[in-house]
Amino acid sequence: MLSKGTKVGAPQYTVEELTALVDEAHSRGLKVASHAHGTQGIINALHAGADTIEHASFIDEEGIRLATANNAALSMDIYVTEYILGEGASAGILEESLEKERMTGSTQRANFRKAVEAGATIVYGTDAGVYPHGQNARQFSRMVRFGMTPLQAIQSATVTAAEVMGWGYDVGKIEAGFAADFVAVKGNPLGNIELLEEPAAVIKGGVRYR
């Protein structure tokens, strides 16, 4: 999307190339995240055995079916389109990229809803680095707006993400024996998910940073 001279949706690797990459990574105990907006690129990555699909903007019913069957997770950053189209130009994002975003954002959100309704595994993802750190919690309310319950959105960033990354034994839960990583908010985020945008406390590894 932000790369110069690229066409939205055009796959850049064959299934054979992707399979070689995935097999090598898995043989070393590594997870594979596939950066894919386009329908065919998503399907290629899923056939190759990718563990997660980043963006998945133009995923279709076949892609959703494959992701579910393969237990692959979708990381669909549906807030970022608002930042890019609202503040991107002043932040130096090229018009070429702004035009790509105009072509993509609404479709990605519609497909996010379809993936949620189909029961696909969805993990919280924000395309970190595109917009200022600290705004990333805005993703939660968009996930709820486009089909998730507040609990599902919170789980996508905690227990579900931990399990997808293979870290479910150590993080993702508030439970004895797990890392003391959590935030506190003034109220119940199950009733108002936007509370997560203003945490009253941030604890990482048992140390309070805010």
Name every feature range the model reports, one short phrase each.
Residues S27-K31, E96, T104-N188:
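His/Asp/Glu-enriched, well-ordered alpha-helical/loop segment
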Residues V202:
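Short aromatic-centered micro-motifs
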